[in-house]
């Protein structure tokens, strides 16, 4: 039996990278339940092995070498390290306690963002624990549309010490 299985070409590969359909459908149902978002499990869901893989894929998809990425400070160091590895220039934007750990849009509006393609946010925020509001997300979307950049909210903590995840 072992010898026969060793000769079977189907036994020498990896599992499909997109995950099994049931997993993707489960993710879609979860997003609908908690966030009211309809996602197509065949085209809009990609299971990952962890956050670093997701951050890498997103940066590869939207940023070319020499372009810029807005990264929160303080924030997850992987945003900076992967952006630099991929040849992007990191532009930090400060999150300050006196501003509730939210972006200072006045400062951002006055920055030269002509080469910025991607802006990372992280709410609930690590390491501050600050939670975003629907108003913050509306403001981020408006900012991104006007500046022609992609906002990515890295959201691994929405169900930790948070009664109403958004």
Regions found by a protein language model. Name each.
Residues 1-50, 57:
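N-terminal small-domain helix-loop-helix segment of the aminotransferase-like
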Residues 20, 51-52, 76, 101:
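Conserved donor sugar-nucleotide recognition element shared by glycan-biosynthetic enzymes
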Residues 39-45, 65-68, 115:
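Short acidic capping loops at alpha-helix termini that bridge into adjacent secondary structure
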Residues 50-56, 73-74, 135, 161:
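Short N-terminal helix/helix-N-cap motif within the alpha/beta-hydrolase-1
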Residues 61-83:
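Conserved PLP-anchoring active-site segment centered on the Schiff-base-forming lysine
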Residues 85-90:
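A short helix-loop-beta submotif of the ANL/AMP-binding
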């Amino acid at each position: 039996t072992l010898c026969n299985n060793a000769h079977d070409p189907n036994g020498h590969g990896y599992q499909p990278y997109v995950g099994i359909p049931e997993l993707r459908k489960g993710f879609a149902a979860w997003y609908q339940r908690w966030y009211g978002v309809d996602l197509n499990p065949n085209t809009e869901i990609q299971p990952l092995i962890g956050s670093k893989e997701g951050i890498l894929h997103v940066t590869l998809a939207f940023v070319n070498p020499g372009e810029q990425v807005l990264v929160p400070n303080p924030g997850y160091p992987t945003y900076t390290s992967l952006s630099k590895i991929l040849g992007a220039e990191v532009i930090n934007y400060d999150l300050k306690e006196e501003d509730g750990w939210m972006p200072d849009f006045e400062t951002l509006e006055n920055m030269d963002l002509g080469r910025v393609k991607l802006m990372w946010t992280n709410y609930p925020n690590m390491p501050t624990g600050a939670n975003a509001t629907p108003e913050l997300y509306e403001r981020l979307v408006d900012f991104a549309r006007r500046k022609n950049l992609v906002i990515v909210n890295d959201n691994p903590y929405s169900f930790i010490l948070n009664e109403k995840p958004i």
